[in-house]
Amino acid sequence: MLDPSSSEEEAEEVVEEPEIKEGQAPTTGTRLSPSRTSESSGGLQPSSRSSSVRPSSPSPSVVSEKEKEELEKLQKEEEERKRKLQLYVFVMRCIAYPFNAKQPTDMARRQQKISKQQLQTVKDRFQAFFNGETQIVADEAFMNAVQSYYEVFLKSDRVARMVQSGGCSANDSREVFKKHIEKRVRSLPEIDGLSKETVLSSWIAKFDAIYRGEEDPRKQQARMTASAASELILSKEQLYEMFQQILGIKKFEHQLLYNACQLDNLDEQAAQIRRELDGRLQMADQIARERKFPKFVSKEMENMYIEELKSSVNLLMANLESMPVSKGGSEFKLQKLKRSHNTSIIDMGEENENQLSKSDVVLSFSLEVVIMEVQGLKSLAPNRIVYCTMEVEGGQKLQTDQAEASKPMWGTQGDFSTTHALPAVKVKLFTESTGVLALEDKELGRVVLHPTPNSPKQSEWHKMTVSKNCPDHDLKIKLAVRMDKPQNMKHCGYLWVIGKNVWKRWKKRFFVLVQVSQYTFAMCSYREKKAEPQELLQLDGYTVDYTDPQPGLEGGRSFFNAVKEGDTVIFASDDEQDRILWVQAMYRATGQSHKPVPPTQVQKLNAKGGNIPQLDAPISQFYADRAQKHGMDEFISSNPCNFDHATLFEMVQRLTLDHRLNDSYSCLGWFSPGQVFVLDEYCARYGVRGCHRHLCYLGDLLERAENGSMVDPTLLHYSFAFCASHVHGNRPDGIGTVTVEEKERFEEIKERLRLLLENQITHFRYCFPFGRPEGALKATLSLLERVLMKDIVTPVPQEDVKNVIRKCLEQAALVNYTRLSEYAKIEENQKDAENVGRLITPAKKLEDTIRLAELVIEVLQQNEEHHAEAFAWWSDLMVEHAETFLSLFAVDMDAALEVQPPDSWESFPLFQLINDFLRSDYNLCNGKFHKHLQDLFAPLVVRYVDLMESSIAQSIHRGFERESWEPVKSLTSNLPNVNLPNVNLPKVPVTLPVNLPQMPSFSAPSWMAAIYDSDNGSATSEDLFWKLDALQTFIRDLHWPEEEFGKHLEQRLKLMASDMIESCVKRTRIAFEVKLQKTSRSTDFRVPQSICTMFNVMVDAKAQSTKLCSMEMGQEHQYHSKIDELIEETVKEMITLLVAKFVTILEGVLSKLSRYDEGTLFSSFLSFTKPGMDLADAYVTFIRHSQDVLRDKVNEEIYIERLFDQWYTSSMNVVCTWLTDRMDLQLHIYQLKTLIRIVKKTYRDFRLQGVLDSTLNSKTYDTVRNRLTVEEATASVSEGGGLQGITMKDSDEEDEEDD
């Protein structure tokens, strides 16, 4: 607190000096000090203060309208300033001495709000993170999550609007990010040893690090701690400072008012309250007498109103009475008196009931006696021991330490307690007796003091009364006696007094003004060494004032009196200052409304140089003079009962709310604890009605909310519920009277509130972006339900609430879609800034619609994520809202689709995007919009499948006509250059007059790589399988929502695949037979690559039919089983045809051997030649080559095994038949050697190819083997040369030799 004479206050005083009431001469109202008179000419006066001096009036013709307006404006500003100063006086008194309210400690702590600059800083920090300019390590998943949060939340215009409204805190940002990542983290795959909670915590920690940036967390924590403390409890000085800012009060103005109001004097503040309460009671009586009531809703409420006024004052009196008189507790609160509610002068007749006795006002004093030193000890030897004793009469005796007579110094303190208002303190000086027979020490001198609480506290020299036998007659002792003033003793001192009933003789007595309780004071006169007062006067009902000297009364210089009906007591003090202090103290005690003005002040005002305070005036008078000099006395001395506190409170509450909404907290309209405390105290002390307070608060909050500020609906709910309860007679604060103004204003507020709430629900995405503030939307819906109630008891029918919310959400759909469309256009314009003026093609329109669909889905997802919980009671309305929202999008979507060329397939991604979202939403799946979407695209899908079927059928026909049957891999060694089928463009025959149907992009089938990594089928078959799989994958990826049509599509595609594969298999079978017919019948035959390719086509057809032709339903496997059977039959036929070809070649060899049959003409000729083994070797080579090619090129092992089994069996059957036909003939040696070679090599080669022993060692083979063995034996006997090492015996050596 500034010192009144400080340089700062004086410096400001120069600027603020000319505060002169209108029409008052400067020299009379404001007297400057001599040193400043030269500055008062007005040259240095600021314009804001010069308005208080009325300028000279020019003629009407000269004064312009503008000047008049300017003058009126200045006058209004001056009136406003005065009103604020007066209001500040009332607020200061509430802060200085609260007796009704306390600063609440249970209020929710508000978060620091984010400003525009801070939001931009946060964005920059996130951008730095993306650019890699931070040290934060992050994986791709976290980067994606942060990028999404940055794009969706931080860059959102709704967040910028929330920041502008003052409702966005750092905690909101953190909570939104937490919610944003929870789904992402939950969807991540499990990692051993790493829980999802750990990942969440890590991500949040990294987010905090990004959000905080390079700022030292310790500094931030310290700042947060300090701000949190200021948000909780404020000191009186902080409260003064805050309301100076709220009301625009300058520091020096506060200092003047603070000192002049004596706010640091609790007695003065309590007295002020007593005077105010007395005034309110008198005002209540005046209203009752004059019948000047407010207009109530019922005439019967007028008498109730008076009772409520008196009851409220009684409550305040009780609160004041409960305030402790002393800080120590109840020691001096002797009794609670049964006072009536009225302390005014009028009803003091029953005072005997409250009469004090002398025992009620016993005081307790603490004394400190400090003995410093003694002077004048000359007769004692320097080494003699001296000491002092001290006592308060009637109490214990204390002694100092011993000291030598040469240095009699102690500094010893003794503490005493006494009930005597005029105690006797005795201090004695002793020396130790040296005599042998001395029984006690010798007293040298003594001093007896009678201190009072007003006595000097510092050490003083006192002359001692010397003992008779002490030679030193000039003994002096330096000591200090400090007598503390009890809390319940308000003033004391000597006064001359005379009264009618007490103190009947004019005499000087020692008086103490004692406060027994907050409402009971007594003037007590005491004698020395007495605990109880000799006489006392209870001050209830008395009025104190200054008076002139009374003739005939000798003694006393300055007179004053205490007057009561039938009694007058005259007092006189020895000086003017003491009189002023006594009058002030008694003025506080009596509770009178009249404020005594000392005669010296009136004289001083008229005296020259009167601004210099008199030497005998108290400091409080000095402050009052200074306040008067600055024009503040009117605010200090004004009677609070004469003001319309309802209007003043409305003003201070509005200004406090403005201040609160502009501070650094995201308060949402909630006052700080300190502000609540001051407003509570003001309402209680000055009788502001609770309903009026809440109506004003609601009005102010609604005004701020309507202008874009974020206001907590729970706060609105509290105030609205209070007002509703009051207006409907429920007495929430015990007040039963309801004024017409309150009722009318409540209805007006109710309607405004209803419109605001409906508007907020309509704009819920923008008023509560991302579900922030938490729970606000839910509270808004709850409040709307309360507002719609006709009274406070009958709940509103749910259907009525539902209809209101339905209407709001219908409008919300339009608002949301309109803003979304505008945003999409802005985004599009920014993207295409360089292509301004280009034509909007159907493709561009479709592209824009797809982008708009993405935004629509994003909005619906955000609604579900952030707002669905609030609408839990009305979830069906949210579904209706979503359908309405989508129906608006449907208009734009339909328009974009209408302009697309016929048979264009570019719109399928739009269907997939929307359908994938809708089918995952339980409420929207197969809803109105979803069915509309299906109706739009079903014909397109059918048309697409028709064209694909036709295209694929024709590609099969043409492909097989031109088919080379070369395997795909052997077409070229460079796979990327292979002319693979175009996934996105299954070719349609040129003869069809349609656009080429292009499939939307999708992932390649899983079997694609496997096909092209091996020597598989032909180009035509691979193209077929690719297209069939691509088509089925595409249709499957559509995820058609309607089950029946989906089954129909699947069934049709499976049937199509079955037909196509069947056609492929049959065409391959025909080509296979044709190919075989064209090949050689001799041992020169080599299995061509095309034969293997055809087999592989069968292999692929079998593999693909499992996927392309099988259905997961019951009837079902008919397509798959049918095509499987066809493939199996075809493969059997192909194997049979190929084996027949091999048998034909073997028969050709045997035909050649037949020429050597015994008895033929040809054999007789050939008997003279010696043919070699060329024929056998050629056949063996043919077998081996064919086996190797088939084994290497055909991919199905089962087919190879079946082929080799059948081939071997057929070969042996042919040989056996040939030998059986020659059963009666002996084989020619050439025949024998050739057959042995063929049979042995065939057996060996097929065994190496894996033919089973059971097949190899068949009866046919045994028959052939036995015959050849017999023939071999016969030939070895008959032929001299033998078989040249060729034998049927198993011999590895022979085999190796033959090889």
UniProtKB/Swiss-Prot annotation:
Q: Where is the C2 domain?
A: 347-462
Q: Which UniProt keywords apply?
A: Calcium, Cytoplasmic vesicle, Exocytosis, Lipid-binding, Membrane, Metal-binding, Protein transport, Synapse, Transport
Give me the stretches of Low complexity compositional bias: 38-63
Q: Which topology term describes how it sits in the membrane?
A: Peripheral membrane protein
- Which residue range or ranges hold the MHD1 domain? 891-1068
Q: Where is the composition biased (Acidic residues)?
A: 1-19
Disulfide bond sites: none
Bias regions of kind Polar residues — which residues? 25-37
Q: Does the keyword Transport apply?
A: yes
Q: What information about domains appears in the record's comments?
A: The PH domain is essential for regulated exocytosis and binds phospholipids.
Q: What the protein does?
A: Calcium-binding protein involved in exocytosis of vesicles filled with neurotransmitters and neuropeptides. Probably acts upstream of fusion in the biogenesis or maintenance of mature secretory vesicles. Regulates catecholamine loading of DCVs. May specifically mediate the Ca(2+)-dependent exocytosis of large dense-core vesicles (DCVs).
Q: What name does UniProt use for this protein?
A: Calcium-dependent secretion activator 1
Q: Which organism is it from?
A: Xenopus laevis
Its lineage opens with: Eukaryota, Metazoa, Chordata, Craniata, Vertebrata
